[in-house]
């Protein structure tokens, strides 16, 4: 309209006059003029890569369909594509997934300052575990309590349990599973040097729970009150457990739930990718650390 000629004066109306009559901001007009024309591609200049966007979309869909876990972001899809021999940059994978509605759904909340500037992630396994509980419903037996124990170094599930009761003895079960699995036996002092992170629930703070943990040689490390970030490793696994099992399936009995939890923990340890460990699975990280520890022992024996 600003380039149209006035029939009276045979001159252009001009952008300022049109904006004033239409009561719109000239800044908005100039900003819209700077936007890319609709026929112009938003792609970065240069070679496309080994496959086109359509082919890459097909590869991404195959990886999503083949995975039995939900909620994985574009970085883990990029890693799975790389393992499958499909090379593409993480930014391109994210763009293609966004354009095709394949990104994991998430909520954008308000950003605020967080005082938790430390870390609860350990460098090696068997230095700190986290334990927590959640609840679900079975059809025949009603409410069921789910207890987990998770390794802080590699996010590995080392113990998982379900029961009708949520008392201190049931809360101990995943910890005892982890001790037997990682240290080979249930005996006094067998897990010396290990810390256990838990919240201030009455079952975890009870005398029986604390005495049993102390007997095994474990140092209790409760998180701060009303600060779930302190037990974030266990909290994050419970979110994954809900998104991939508890919210997707129904169970008739607690025993059926317990069997499903054991199977899910096995599959999780073998297939879940941990980004901070180079997109390796928890089982791979533990196996690599075990091999390094054995090599260190062999070197000491040779040196002696």
Give residue ranges: language-model regions.
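Short, amphipathic alpha-helical "recognition" segments used to contact nucleic acids or chromatin
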Residues: 1-13, 57, 61-68
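Two-metal-ion RNase H-like nuclease active-site motif
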Residues: 126-136
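RNase H-like polynucleotidyl transferase catalytic core
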Residues: 18, 107-111, 196-200, 214-233, ...
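Residue-level signal for the short linker/turn that defines the boundary of a DNA-recognition helix
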Residues: 12-14, 72, 88, 252
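C-terminal domain-tail junction helix/linker
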Residues: 46, 207, 214-218, 240-304
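Basic, flexible linker segments flanking DNA-binding modules
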Residues: 19, 26-128, 227-228, 281-290
